[in-house]
């Protein structure tokens, strides 16, 4: 199979894979090298859905931010949705060891104490407590979920 340079670049710009790491006593977390290459040094960590944290590269955060800005301020759900993601959002930087310092409120929100899973999710990274990851990502009902995705237009 022949791949084009554009396709190779696109693959490099996606976050994929599952990595197990630990948060140290100071709240620092090592970011896998594959993720660091794409994050560079401009990224945002915020509350995510399902009790995890979302990590957006700067450019993806800007796209998300524009979508949030487009929501009507007169809609209460839109305000709550925006508040959920933006109020706790924190710009982060990698230190020389490739770690980030996760603010305590975000660690508490996601229940991050020691063992964590970093999951690449195409345009973002999710940071989960290992326990929540295991609870939320069982494959027991994947056939049902696949059927629902088909209803949304995603067919495998």
Regions found by a protein language model. Give the residues of each.
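Flexible "stalk/tail and boundary" regions
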Residues: 1-21, 25, 35-92, 96, ...
């Amino acid at each position: 199979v022949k791949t084009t340079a554009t396709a190779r670049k696109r693959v490099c710009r996606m976050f994929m894979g599952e990595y197990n790491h630990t948060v140290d006593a100071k709240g620092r977390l090592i970011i896998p090298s594959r993720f660091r290459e794409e994050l560079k040094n401009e990224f945002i960590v915020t509350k995510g859905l399902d009790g995890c944290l979302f990590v957006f590269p700067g450019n993806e955060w800007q796209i998300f931010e524009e979508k949030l800005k487009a929501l009507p301020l007169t809609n209460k759900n839109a305000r709550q949705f925006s508040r959920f993601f933006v109020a706790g959002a924190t710009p982060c930087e990698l230190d020389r060891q490739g770690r980030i310092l996760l603010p305590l409120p975000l660690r508490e929100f996601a229940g991050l104490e020691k063992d964590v899973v970093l999951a690449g999710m195409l345009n973002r990274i999710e940071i989960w407590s290992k326990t929540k990851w295991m609870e939320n990502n069982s494959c027991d009902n994947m056939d049902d979920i696949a059927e629902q995705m088909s209803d949304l237009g995603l067919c495998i």
